[in-house]
Structures are given as C-alpha cells and as structure tokens.
UniProtKB/Swiss-Prot annotation:
Because S100A10 induces the dimerization of ANXA2/p36, it may function as a regulator of protein phosphorylation in that the ANXA2 monomer is the preferred target (in vitro) of tyrosine-specific kinase. The lineage of its organism: Eukaryota, Metazoa, Chordata, Craniata, Vertebrata. This is Protein S100-A10. Residues 60-71 are annotated as: Ancestral calcium site. It comes from Homo sapiens (Human). GO terms for cellular component: AnxA2-p11 complex; cell surface; collagen-containing extracellular matrix; cytoplasm; extracellular exosome; extracellular region; nuclear matrix; plasma membrane. The modification N6-acetyllysine is found at residues 23, 28, 37, 54, 57. Transmembrane segments: none annotated. InterPro entries: EF-hand-dom_pair, S100-A10, S100/CaBP7/8-like_CS, S100_Ca-bd_sub.
C-alpha cells in the first residue's frame, strides 16, 4: 500500500498525463482546463484574467507552446511553496492570539 507521499506523487503524474494525453505535454488549452478543474480556487482568486497565459509563458521555456512534466512539476512546487508560506504565517498569527 503506497504511503501518502507516494500517493501524492502518483496523483501528480496521473493528473499531468490525464490532461496531456498521448502527446506527453500540455498545450495552453490543456493547461487552462487542468487549472480550471484541479485548481479552481487558485484561478478564482486571481485578479488577472490572463493568469493562465502568464503561467504558460513562464512554464514554456522552449517557447514551443508545450509544457512538459518537469515544468508542470515546477508549477506544483511553486504553488505548494506559496501555500506553505501562507500556512506558516497564518499559524504564527494564530499562535500570537
């Protein structure tokens, strides 16, 4: 039986491939659909309607309109770090009360 971390890794891999399909990469449209389905709260809180376009530009390092798994994982890592930073600040504030 996989551990929670192994399950989390498996979920990230399966999610990427679910949206990438057989081609093995995400297009901007694939990324938009993935973000809408898997990160609806993140997109709802964005004040910029071009958020997905900007994310795609940041992730598409080769400028070929494709986002591979490594770039996708860097997005997940960045979002996780931001969430952790918020969590740490929130917990410190909660502890001061």
């Amino acid at each position: 039986m996989p551990s929670q971390m192994e399950h989390a890794m498996e979920t990230m891999m399966f999610t990427f491939h679910k949206f990438a399909g057989d081609k093995g990469y995400l297009t901007k449209e694939d990324l938009r659909v993935l973000m809408e389905k898997e990160f609806p709260g993140f997109l709802e809180n964005q004040k910029d309607p071009l958020a997905v376009d900007k994310i795609m530009k940041d992730l598409d390092q080769c400028r070929d309109g494709k986002v591979g798994f490594q770039s996708f994982f860097s997005l997940i890592a960045g979002l996780t770090i931001a969430c952790n930073d918020y969590f740490v600040v929130h917990m410190k504030q909660k502890g001061k009360k």
